[in-house]
């Protein structure tokens, strides 16, 4: 399933636009990056190396920040377009997968681990 770069980015923007204001406000300093494929370093973060890496949160979750949290680079959520295209067979499925991935990575920002996110459908 192929989607243009613009369509992929619009799908991400739609998920972010649909977030409740109280969550969106907290995410203002989180960068969202889109790239075609994960690199070796990013792939090394996978707990299941047999699957596709759809997204990656890099930063300090809000639950781990202390009063001394300052002067650090912004957190980044990276979404990988190629893996999304490979695991989906329809436009609707692709848009749903993008939504699920964005919300999954935002979950990491809020301190939830993979086990928790997967058990709740993300």
Predicted regions and their residues:
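Active-site rim/adjacent substrate-binding subdomains
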Residues: 1-97, 109, 115-118
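Short alpha-helical catalytic segment bearing the HExxH-like zincin motif
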Residues: 97-105
